[in-house]
Amino acid sequence: MNWQIAIDGPSSSGKSSVAKKIAEELDFFYFSSGKMYRAFAYVMQVNRLNIDLFLKIINQINWRFEKDAVYYNNADITTVITTQSVANIASKIAVDPNIRKIAVIKQQKLAENKNIVMDGRDIGTVVLKNAQLKFFLDAKVEIRAQRRLQDMGISLSNEKKLKELIQELKQRDQIDSSRTADPLKKAQDAIYLDTSELSFDAVVKQTLKEAKKVFKL
């Protein structure tokens, strides 16, 4: 039997960092669904495709999603898909129902026959809805903005940038939670964790405790 852990949450809630650490500790395969949308966006960008054209050729595309890498035509694109230009395209196409439908199928296929930790915004509700363990990580938008600022290497004293990030996150939350296709929401059987006042290590400790209890590790 294969074990599945689904971790969802809004942008900058810490889900990817926590998911990756849990997978490392449990020796599970780790995958962030965001990588797939970014890979889609990259292919569209380099080939100058709109969504309709992309959907016509998507099943002919040669790509591979591995534990820590993404390949397109056997070239490692893991780093290039992290650029802001790719991220901007990814956020736009991620709301398209047809894109999401294909992504879900590919993510479910990726999860077959392995122990996996997957994070995203619809993992526990759609992609791995039968996962044995689900978490929904959340945090106050101000805290998430501060974390994003720190990740960018910008001082927390930069109030102008902080306010901009707060607004960006609020807008992203609205888009994610109100889209018609697979909106961001907590799965009924997910464990809710507000990480606003918790350290990274504390969140990892709590999630690992639950995992070891459920999987009897």
Swiss-Prot record:
Entry binding sites for ATP: 9-17
EC class? transferase
Give the signal sequence positions.
none
Entries under InterPro entries matching the protein: Cytidylate_kin, Cytidylate_kinase_dom, P-loop_NTPase
Q: What is its main location?
A: cytoplasm
Q: Which GO terms describe its cellular component?
A: cytosol
UniProt KW keywords: ATP-binding, Cytoplasm, Kinase, Nucleotide-binding, Transferase
Enumerate the subcellular locations listed in this protein's record, separating them with semicolons. Answer: Cytoplasm
Q: Enumerate the catalysed reactions.
A: CMP + ATP = CDP + ADP; dCMP + ATP = dCDP + ADP
Q: Which domain of life is it from?
A: Bacteria
Q: Which family does it belong to?
A: Belongs to the cytidylate kinase family. Type 1 subfamily.
The UniProt entry, under NCBIfam families, shows: cmk (TIGR00017)
Q: Give the protein's recorded name.
A: Cytidylate kinase
Q: State the organism named in the record.
A: Mycoplasma genitalium (strain ATCC 33530 / DSM 19775 / NCTC 10195 / G37)
